[in-house]
């Protein structure tokens, strides 16, 4: 059997591994931190930019404010309380008007919860059915929230205080995110 026109498929060229020898730029490090934060909370670029701009205007550490604001979003609070298995599922519960904050219907997932807010599920059969298939998300409830998921009654959550750095268990350097957006000002 000769070599003919068909190429020998057993041979292939080994590509040189340039990624190991190439130095990662500071821009790349900042972009990765920003993307990790963005995808973890399911935000668009514009939403995250809005939170960074709010953080710049506040007093205190600019890097710590965006994670605090993101942790206090209604969709994230519902996820952390265990009422939804994922943040997108929590967003859907809010959008479909299944959630009450202080006994008022809130259908905006980006609603910023405040301390002493009481989050409950509407007293409708469809609202209760929406939660039946959900399993507790994230394991333990953070210390800035209190959950009561007792059988027979509606699931209820209470926001005790504003989230702090310890309750946000992300391995992200928030200052890198702020530095990334310092170019966009």
From Swiss-Prot:
Keywords (A to Z) from UniProt: Chloroplast, Plastid, Ribonucleoprotein, Ribosomal protein, RNA-binding, rRNA-binding
Subcellular location: Plastid, Chloroplast
Gene3D superfamilies per record: Ribosomal Protein S4 Delta 41, Chain A, domain 1 (1.10.1050.10), RNA-binding S4 domain (3.10.290.10)
GO CC annotations on file: chloroplast; small ribosomal subunit
Superkingdom per UniProt: Eukaryota
Region (Disordered): 132-154
Principal location listed in the UniProt entry: plastid
Start and end residues of each S4 RNA-binding domain: 72-134
Pfam family name, one: Ribosomal_S4
GO molecular function terms noted in the UniProt entry: rRNA binding; structural constituent of ribosome
Signal sequence interval, chain numbering: none
Entry's Gene Ontology BP terms: ribosomal small subunit biogenesis; translation
Record field: transmembrane: none
Subunit structure: Part of the 30S ribosomal subunit. Contacts protein S5. The interaction surface between S4 and S5 is involved in control of translational fidelity.
Family as reported in the entry's similarity comment: Belongs to the universal ribosomal protein uS4 family.
Function per UniProt: One of the primary rRNA binding proteins, it binds directly to 16S rRNA where it nucleates assembly of the body of the 30S subunit. With S5 and S12 plays an important role in translational accuracy.
UniProt protein name: Small ribosomal subunit protein uS4c
Species in which this protein is naturally found: Woodwardia unigemmata
